[in-house]
Design a protein with these regions (language model features):
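Bacterial signal peptide processing site
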Residues: 1-2
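Long, acidic low-complexity intrinsically disordered regions
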Residues: 9, 13, 20-23, 37
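Divalent cation-coordinating acidic motifs and surrounding scaffolds
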Residues: 25, 29-327
Length: 327
C-alpha cells in the first residue's frame, strides 16, 4: 500500500470494554496463585494467572505509513500506562518491534542513480545509505534497533541491556518505543507483516545467540499487534499457516496468545484502492478471526488508535486471568 489513505472517524470493532469501578479502573484484574495451606480459600483456579507478558509489534515500513506510525506512537503511552495499572504482570514485560522487510530501499550497496536512493535515503541526514547496520538489522523478524531511511528515527535507538527489545527498567520507555517504532517509509513496497511476525517468533531467531534471544518466554503470554495499510496480498503463506506458526511458538497453547491487527477495513471506507480483486485486508481479518475472543481487528485508517488499544487491554486482561503457565 504505497498510496496514502484518508483517516476515518468511525469506531473500531472488537471485544467489549472492561467493567470499571468508580475510579475508572478495571474491576476484572488477573487472578494470581495463592498458596494452598489446606483451609485457605483461593481466588481463581490454582496455578492460573499470567506473571509475564511478551509484546510484539509488527509495523509496516512502506511508503504510505508515516501517519499510521505517528498514530501508533501517540497511542503507546496510554496503552502501556493502562497495562501497568491493570495487569499485575506489568512488572515483567518485554516489548519488541519488528518491521515488514529485510531489504528496504536503503539496503547497501545503494544505487545512487535510482529515484529510491534520492527520495528515501539521501534525503535524510545522515544519509541512510551510510548507516552502519549489523546482520540483525537486515534480518526480517529481528527486533528493530536502528531504523533507517525517510521518516525513520535514523539513529541507533538507546535500548538498555543490549537486547533488541525493551524491558520495564528502560529509563525512558516511551521515548525508546517512539524511536524504534518510527521505522520509517523506506521499506520494501511488498509489505509482509505476517512473515515478519512468524520469523520474529521462530525458534532459530529466539535461540541463544539469535537476534531475538530471550524474547519469547514459555511462561509468558504473547501479545501480537500488527499494523499495515496494504490492500494487497504480499505475505507468503496462508492464514492457516501463520496461525499454526504462532501457535507452535507457544507450544500449542492458544490461551497464551492475543492477536490485534490494525488493517484495511473496506466497509469503513478504509484502504480501498479501487481494485475489486484486491483482498483489502481480508486475509489478515481471517487470521485474526482464528483467535476467537483473543483476536481484535481495528481500522488502520483511524486517526486515533486509543479506543482500539483500550479494547486490546480488556482482551489481554482476560487472557492473563485464564493463563496456566507450563509445568
Amino acid at each position: 500500500g504505497d498510496s496514502p489513505t484518508e483517516p476515518t472517524t468511525s469506531g473500531t470493532s472488537g471485544a467489549s470494554l472492561p467493567a470499571t469501578d468508580d475510579t475508572g479502573m478495571s474491576d476484572t484484574l488477573p487472578k494470581f496463585d495463592v498458596l494452598d495451606t489446606g483451609d485457605v480459600i483461593t481466588t481463581g483456579a490454582p496455578d492460573m494467572g499470567c506473571k509475564k507478558v511478551d509484546f510484539l509489534f509488527v509495523i509496516d515500513n512502506s511508503a504510505s505509513m508515516e501517519d499510521n506510525q505517528a498514530a501508533l506512537i501517540a497511542s503507546f503511552p496510554g496503552f502501556i500506562d493502562t497495562i501497568e495499572q491493570t495487569l499485575s504482570a506489568s512488572n515483567d514485560y518485554q516489548i519488541m518491534v519488528v518491521d515488514t522487510d529485510d531489504d528496504g530501499r536503503c539496503k547497501k550497496p545503494c544505487d545512487t542513480n535510482s529515484s529510491d536512493y534520492t527520495d528515501f535515503c539521501a534525503i535524510v541526514k545522515p544519509n541512510a545509505c551510510n548507516a552502519k547496520l549489523d546482520a540483525c538489522d537486515t534480518t526480517r523478524g529481528a527486533g528493530v534497533v536502528h531504523p533507517v531511511g525517510l521518516y525513520s528515527s535514523n539513529v541507533v535507538c538507546p535500548i538498555t541491556g543490549g537486547n533488541r527489545y525493551m524491558l520495564p527498567a528502560e529509563p525512558d520507555l516511551q521515548s525508546t518505543f517512539a524511536c524504534v517504532a518510527r521505522v520509517g517509509t523506506a521499506g520494501n513496497p511488498s509489505e509482509r507483516p505476517m512473515n515478519g511476525m512468524t520469523e520474529a517468533l521462530s525458534s532459530t531467531i529466539n535461540a541463544p545467540g539469535g537476534c531475538n534471544a530471550g524474547f519469547l518466554r514459555d511462561d509468558a503470554i504473547l501479545v501480537i499487534t500488527f499494523i499495515s495499510d496494504d490492500p494487497n496480498y504480499e505475505d507468503k503463506g496462508t492464514p492457516q499457516e501463520w496461525y499454526d506458526a504462532v501457535l507452535a511458538s507457544k507450544q500449542g497453547n492458544k490461551d497464551a496468545i492475543v492477536v490485534a491487527g490494525l488493517i484495511p477495513q473496506p466497509a469503513m471506507g478504509c484502504a480501498d484502492n479501487g481494485d475489486p480483486g484486491a483482498p483489502k485486508g481480508s486475509h489478515w481479518a481471517e487470521f485474526i478471526a482464528m483467535w476467537g475472543d483473543h483476536g481484535l481487528s481495528g481500522s488502520v485508517c483511524e486517526a486515533d488508535y486509543s479506543p482500539f488499544f483500550t479494547q486490546a487491554v480488556a482482551i489481554i486482561d482476560d487472557a492473563c486471568d485464564n493463563f496456566v503457565p507450563p509445568g
